[in-house]
Structures are given as structure tokens and as C-alpha cells.
Amino acid sequence: MVDCIVKNWQGEEVGNASLTLRVAKEENAAHIVHRALVRQQNNARQGNASAKTRAEVRGGGRKPWKQKGTGRARAGSIRSPLWRGGGVIFGPKPRDYSQKMNRKERRLALRTAIASRADNMVVVEAFGDQFSQPKTKELATALTRWGAKPEKRVLLILDEIPENVFLSGRNIPYLKILRADNLNIYDVLVADTIVATATALEKIQEVYGE
């Protein structure tokens, strides 16, 4: 059970809201949330880092000097890893970093993460009608009224994202706006404050509640 304070547009407390989510057992919670987080971050990796071995570096086919008689250390190629400009030993090659995780586990991890952020979550009344046109300053001021600390990461969860709200928030560097049915574990965990509308909370209950 997640209990949250409901605030209006002016930042005044007008009630309470609750969210009932089935979460992981306490002894397993940290492990399953960690797995889901690592999976998401790994799946976002391009995996295209690449370095050339001594066989792939251009040149180096001719022996730089004869084997014996020069007094210098023997050398077979100017592209030896020991040489400047040579190949790389055990360097990275393009690879697939993606990890698999069962859908039930992913959803359990997300519900557990949401429930763990209850102390940092604020529910607000729907405010889309406050923006007849994009106003970045008004949205930034509203976030402060709702308890978000200046320059600290804020996750704003809406059931639908009105265009004027999106345009108002896209230039606020510390703000991330997501739909309630498109949450991810990284943004839920990394936000310092989570602000959700009452309708978004209902959507979360509908989509993720079990």
C-alpha cells in the first residue's frame, strides 16, 4: 500500500490517495530491482566499441630489420602491440550487451521500485487546463509549490501528456515527463521527487496493480 498526499494547483493539501501494488518480498526486493535496473542500462548500450588487433591494423607486413646482427631487440612487425601505433591486445569488439528478464519479474521489480519511492511521491490534481499555451516558468514554479527541490531531478507522471504541458516541460533540464503506462525502473529510481496526477495514479493501478 502506497499512501500519498494530494495537492491542488496552488500546492495546498486537499486529500490523500493510495496505491495498492504487489511487491517483492523484503529479502528479494533489492536483488530483483537491481537485476531489472542493470538489464535496462545494458539494453540501452550500443555495443559498437571496436579496436583493431595487430592483424587488422594497416601495414606491418614487412620485418622492420633483420633478426640478428643489429644489436637491437628482435622485431617482426611495426604493428606489434608493444609498438606505438600497433594493434590492441584483447581490445573491445562489437557485441550485444542485452539481457533477458521474464516479464513477470520486470513488472514485479517496477512495482517494488514505485512502492519504495512512496516518501518522495506527491499526487496532484489534473492541471492540463492551466496551460492554454506553453509556459515553462509556470510549470517550474508549480513543481516547486508541489515540493520539488530546485535543480533536483523530478519525474512527472501523467495519464496523457497534453502538448502544451510537454512543450512547457521540455526545456526544464531536471524534469522528465512520462505516461503512466510507459514507466521504466531507471527513471523511477533516479528521480529525487515523483509528481503524479490523480488520474495517472489510477492508470498505474490499472496497468501495474495486481
UniProtKB/Swiss-Prot annotation:
A GO cellular component entry from the record: ribosome
Cross-referenced Gene3D superfamilies: 3.40.1370.10
GO biological process: translation
Region annotated Disordered, chain positions: 41-77
Keywords: Ribonucleoprotein, Ribosomal protein, RNA-binding, rRNA-binding
InterPro entries assigned: Ribosomal_uL4, Ribosomal_uL4-like, Ribosomal_uL4_dom_sf
Chain intervals with Basic residues compositional bias: 60-71
Molecular-function GO term, any one: rRNA binding
Subunit record text: Part of the 50S ribosomal subunit.
Family assignment from sequence similarity: Belongs to the universal ribosomal protein uL4 family.
Function of the molecule: One of the primary rRNA binding proteins, this protein initially binds near the 5'-end of the 23S rRNA. It is important during the early stages of 50S assembly. It makes multiple contacts with different domains of the 23S rRNA in the assembled 50S subunit and ribosome.
PANTHER family hit by this protein: 50S RIBOSOMAL PROTEIN L4, LARGE RIBOSOMAL SUBUNIT PROTEIN UL4C
HAMAP family reported in the protein's UniProt record: Ribosomal_uL4_B
Listed name of the protein: Large ribosomal subunit protein uL4
Organism: Synechocystis sp. (strain ATCC 27184 / PCC 6803 / Kazusa)
